[in-house]
């Protein structure tokens, strides 16, 4: 037995015994399958609105606000959707489309087409005003117009078309800024200014009305084809879905892929 002092081994040093060499194949431990998976993708979006016209379209108006504003109007007051409500409703329609609802599919097609048309209208006005602003003498330099304190808003949408609605509103905000700039410098009249603003605002409100008038119904293509109670009730309320919508021939660019069960 070796002596130790203060925990230090004082025994004569010996080489450790080495294992005998072997000619057998080494044992290979089964490798654990490595899980190659990245984390969830994440992105945030914020926007600045510079004009009261765009901010009012973002906020919408409740029935009581509409009644106060239109006190002399003979029309009954109605609720005007806000952009967050439009985004939320577009998300609901998108999820119904994912669940194979042909009526939701039809509305997505209608909504996408309307957004394309309204976007073109707004962009044409922006281009027209931009050309007017360029008509000033070359010795004059105008800076881009913007609010000294814009409204900063965080935006989240569960559907691509919800974001397309937001892009449209941002385009209208740019339109309004350029229109007010052109009017401020005497390049357009007040009547022309109001005409441009009304044209752009109407393009936005058309999108709002499409989404606002949507009524959800729990039904699938199979319900329609099999004439289930849910399918018959939906047909009674909203009519027979378009054949091209049912077959999937006509769909929104952002719709999910049709499942085979749904008749694709």
Task: Spell out what each predicted region is.
Residues 177-178, 191:
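Mid-to-C-terminal oligomerization/interaction "stalk" domains of large proteins
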Residues 2-168, 174, 181, 200-264:
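Polar/charged low-complexity regulatory segments
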Residues 187-188:
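Conserved hydrophobic residue
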Residues 193-196, 200:
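Extended, well-ordered alpha-helical scaffold segments
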Residues 178-179, 196:
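Short, hydrophobic/aromatic alpha-helical segments in well-folded domains
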């Amino acid at each position: 037995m070796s002596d130790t002092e203060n925990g230090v081994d004082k025994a004569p040093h010996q080489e450790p015994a080495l294992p005998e060499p072997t000619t057998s194949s080494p044992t290979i431990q089964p490798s654990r399958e490595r899980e190659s998976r990245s984390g969830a993708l994440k992105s945030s979006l914020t926007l600045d609105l510079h004009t009261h016209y765009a901010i009012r379209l973002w906020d919408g108006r409740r029935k009581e606000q509409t009644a106060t504003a239109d006190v002399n109007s003979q029309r009954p007051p109605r609720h005007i959707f806000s952009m967050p409500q439009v985004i939320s409703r577009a998300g609901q329609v998108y999820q119904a489309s994912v669940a194979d609802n042909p009526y939701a599919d039809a509305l997505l097609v209608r909504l996408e087409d309307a957004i394309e048309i309204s976007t073109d209208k707004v962009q044409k006005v922006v281009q027209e005003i931009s050309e007017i602003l360029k008509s000033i003498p070359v010795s004059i330099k105008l800076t881009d117009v913007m609010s000294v304190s814009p409204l900063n808003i965080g935006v989240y949408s569960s559907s691509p078309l919800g974001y397309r609605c937001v892009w449209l509103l941002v385009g209208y905000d740019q339109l309004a800024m350029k229109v007010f700039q052109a009017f401020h410098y005497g390049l357009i009249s007040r009547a022309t200014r109001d005409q441009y603003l009304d044209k752009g605002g109407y393009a936005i409100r058309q999108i709002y009305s499409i989404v606002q008038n949507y009524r959800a119904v729990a039904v699938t293509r199979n319900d329609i084809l099999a004439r289930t109670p849910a399918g018959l009730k939906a047909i009674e309320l909203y009519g027979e879905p378009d054949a091209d919508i049912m077959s999937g021939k006509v769909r929104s660019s952002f719709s999910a892929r049709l499942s085979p069960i749904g008749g694709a």
